């Protein structure tokens, strides 16, 4: 069985590269896929079978086009994606309690986190207990017998390029 990938959703190529380097160094067995906006990521989710879903989403909130909150709401609306753990990385001051409904497992401040913080959070999220919980959720949703996740609705808003 192939290892489930980690999805990196980050519009800054420099930060995306930093995340990839740390993932490759500390988690070489886990494939990664980078998306530079929420629309690309959402399109990828719509083409994946449940077995191909990521084990973790590393998500920047302030994305160009639809933001990370828009993507989180979209993921939450489908049983197949609602339980994927999320590591938020943002320069915004976000409270953990308000984000638990989105399956956010940890938040790192983009301006102050260290490589050790990044690796520790990922190890915590991908611990065997967490993986077992996610696997159990995926088994229960397999009863739907769908080959892929139903079509997504996330679209760019005109003039929204912030």
Which residues does each predicted region cover?
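Acidic, metal-coordinating helix/loop segments flanking the phosphotransfer/catalytic sites
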Residues: 34-56
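The feature encodes the CheY-like receiver
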Residues: 64
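Two-component/phosphorelay signaling modules centered on CheY-like receiver
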Residues: 13-37
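CheY-like receiver
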Residues: 115, 129-162
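Active-site residues of response regulator receiver
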Residues: 59-61
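Conserved acidic carboxylate
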Residues: 10
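Hydrophobic/aromatic residues positioned on beta-strands within the core alpha/beta folds
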Residues: 87-89, 110
């Amino acid at each position: 069985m192939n290892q489930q990938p980690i999805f990196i959703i980050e519009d800054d190529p420099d930060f995306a590269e930093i995340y990839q380097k740390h993932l490759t160094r500390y988690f070489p067995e886990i494939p990664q896929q980078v998306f530079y906006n929420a629309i690309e990521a959402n399109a990828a989710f719509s083409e994946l079978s449940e077995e191909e879903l990521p084990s973790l989403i590393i998500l920047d909130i302030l994305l160009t086009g639809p933001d990370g909150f828009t993507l989180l709401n979209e993921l939450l609306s489908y049983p197949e994606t609602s339980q994927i753990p999320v590591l938020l990385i943002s320069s915004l001051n976000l409270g953990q309690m308000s984000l638990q409904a989105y399956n956010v497992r940890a938040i790192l401040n983009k301006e102050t986190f260290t490589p050790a913080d990044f690796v520790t959070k990922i190890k915590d999220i991908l611990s065997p207990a967490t993986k077992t919980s996610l696997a159990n959720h995926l088994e229960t949703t397999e009863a739907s017998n769908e080959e892929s996740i139903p079509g997504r609705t996330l679209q760019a808003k005109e003039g929204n390029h912030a």
